[in-house]
């Protein structure tokens, strides 16, 4: 599902979603169903392999939710992924995939944008599971990005990472200002 990394099922599905392949594509829908049948971790998210069978990756869950929602996966089949994501919100309002691996205490723009895209696509598809919780988390995550003025440290005012100013495609899991601006224009 996730290896080899850049040509894996996961990133292929993300690319197809970002290219706006028709959302009723049956082959893609069947592939997503197979992922859901074979790759759920103990925490309800998507496992990448044996090392993530207990704790899934927050970034991957956000990206998976994005394309699974876009391709009209059954809402009920995504409840555990929503629950898993909502359990990972950090005190500063965003998300960080390293919380389950190395105990990160500050949110990451990379992870936060992936989760925001997933939650927004879930709602855009008309799904209503945990609607109020999702709205609250989206608000705090957007505030987290805006607090950083898209790319600046909230502590020092310096550029967090110069790569945030490079406009790349496909972005995969990486954050940049174009991806953030695209998110804001897409979600209104």
What are these regions (language model features)?
Residues 1-188:
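Preference for long, amphipathic alpha-helical scaffolds in soluble/luminal domains
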